[in-house]
Amino acid sequence: MDKKYEKISQDLGVTLKQIDTVLSLTAEGATIPFIARYRKDMTGSLDEVAIKAIIDLDKSLTNLNDRKEAVLAKIQEQGKLTKELEEAILAAEKLADVEELYLPYKEKRRTKATIAREAGLFPLARLILQNVTDLEKEAEKFVCEGFATGKEALAGAVDILVEALSEDVTLRAMTYQEVLRHSKLTSQVKDESLDEKQVFQIYYDFSETVGTMQGYRTLALNRGEKLGVLKVGFEHATDRILAFFAARFKVKNAYIDEVVQQSVKKKVLPAIERRIRTELTEKAEEGAIQLFSDNLRNLLLVAPLKGRVVLGFDPAFRTGAKLAVVDTTGKMLTTQVIYPVKPASARQIEEAKRDLADLIGQYGVEIIAIGNGTASRESEAFVAEVLKDFPEVSYVIVNESGASVYSASELARQEFPNLTVEKRSAISIARRLQDPLAELVKIDPKSIGVGQYQHDVSQKKLSESLDFVVDTVVNQVGVNINTASPALLSHVAGLNKTISENIVKYREEEGKITSRAQIKKVPRLGAKAFEQAAGFLRIPESSNILDNTGVHPENYVAVKELFKRLDIKDLNEEAQGKLKSLSVKEMAQELDLGPETLKDIIADLLKPGRDFRDSFDAPVLRQDVLDIKDLVVGQKLEDVVRNVVDFGAFVDIGIHEDGLIHISHMSRKFIKHPSQVVSVGDLVTVWVKKIDTEREKVNLSLLAPNETD
């Protein structure tokens, strides 16, 4: 146990006490958000990411240790466990290294070498090693069933030596390091006809040293290979590797040469190549999942546009655009279908203009949220034309990824049973603008288009990572228990799908929940669930102001005492002045609270009901459409980052296609990844660097034209 903790401490830079605290709290049923928010004084203020890293690494090391014990037991049963081997297995830091050490002792299926040994050909193999002069003649003595000639007997003896040599742990380790440092991963086009859009063109004749392979390239090669477009292989310094193996023998002869050739080319290199490909893929997946997770987090934290009446506009050509107006709380007011773009007739388009204008006037629409899917560009032009008569109304292009998935889901059917899928989608688009977090949690995170190669990675690992991000953000923001959907509530610490549905049912039957104490009356919501969830649930309707803050009920008595000592009866300006000026360290001791806990309590009391998303950039509102022909090189723009990938970032600049900032145009200093400079949702100032009107591609730069670019 101590060694495991030491390893976690070394890898993650945390103390043994922090590790023990986190794992003990987890064992008691505490959730990551709860530990991060309400046990800071115990953990040394570890955040959610650090806490999860401790839990994950502990689990990984436990699995590794379990495998080591199983392998040691198997070798011990064979009576072949030496002290050196035991030490090597116990020192192994990767599961793959344990398996490499176990390989010579692993129970094997019947191989050519096994059959040869059973036929008594091992002594002949020894003769090969002794470089006996007339091996062919000696081999005649070993003719038996299955090995009818001396030549066949020698082939069997070679098989025995090949298996033994190919399982040499030291040679395999040397080969692994050689491949890692000097070999190249290559790809050639296999069937160009399967690559109609030339997506994989740069990989038609590609090579890269294994040790410097970038993750997105690994995943691209994997996808191209899977689709049958590419043939992926390795380029080795084979002669050098063969020399490693040949040096194992004191003598040389044709049979030993054959043993070396077969061991390297048929056994060891293919196995090492498989291992390297697996490790490259795992590393690439880890990077892709982390990037997707970071992008998702930033998307979920986009500032909500509260208190606005929004019209959701789901564009389409033939079937017409679906419109939905929602009030300031997200409640649907009306839906309608219009035909604003061709192939609609001129009469239909004019009618659509009147209908949209009527909706704006009738419901006091303040913002139009246009989905960025099919017919988005044409719909944007249509909306901009109508808004010439409504200077007080703006529009926003909204990323509609996943809206269709939600609108066809059981959740959407329950919410709007009498509406078509398309109208539900328009409502979702409108609500995404009002409160991105509340709406996006209804959708499988994998359907939200802010990833890179997300379909090529482990879906289980991706889901786990994205769910963690959603859980973290939901609890950091807090949830209004009286307005939240079951989907949003289910991400609150301590709550599951059943309890979340019970909360909504309780609201429907009993009316609004008016205190945190009342939450305990919800069926199936026990003491542990209440402990974990209560601090993250907000109740604006409560007579107790603490119920609408992040202050946990376990600290209400301490806060009451704090108010008494400071003579605070209301959280007015005078009270805030007292809270700001008090000595946290001294007061924490007097109240028997941890200093970090008191700091958080004061922060909540200074801004009750705060939504920290308000400090992030809001969407860019537009009133007029921009065409690629309106752009000029060197033009300055201010727009929002839509997606971040390994090679750059895509920015919504108001035309049909997002502009690309390549990583080389992000900073005058060297950066390893675009995420060091920008995040999804960031409002950035960019300059147009290159315009390709024909392909509708725009290259951007974060560097002003007068800077070194």
Task: Show which residues each predicted segment covers.
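Generic start-of-chain signal for non-secretory N-termini
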Residues: 1-20, 27
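Short beta-alpha connecting loops at secondary-structure transitions
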Residues: 19, 338-343, 367, 408-421, ...
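Accessory alpha-helical DNA-binding modules that contact the DNA backbone or grooves
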Residues: 31-32, 43, 47-148, 476-615, ...
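Duplex nucleic acid-engaging cores and interfaces of nucleic-acid transaction enzymes
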Residues: 50-53, 60, 64-312, 316-418, ...
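Long, charge-rich intrinsically disordered scaffolds of nucleic-acid metabolism proteins
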Residues: 97, 396, 402, 407-477, ...
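Low-complexity, acidic/Ser/Thr- and charged residue-rich accessory regions of DNA metabolism proteins
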Residues: 138-150, 206, 245-264, 268, ...
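A glycine-rich phosphate-binding loop feature that marks nucleotide/adenosyl-phosphate handling sites
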Residues: 177-185, 313-317, 373-378, 398-405, ...
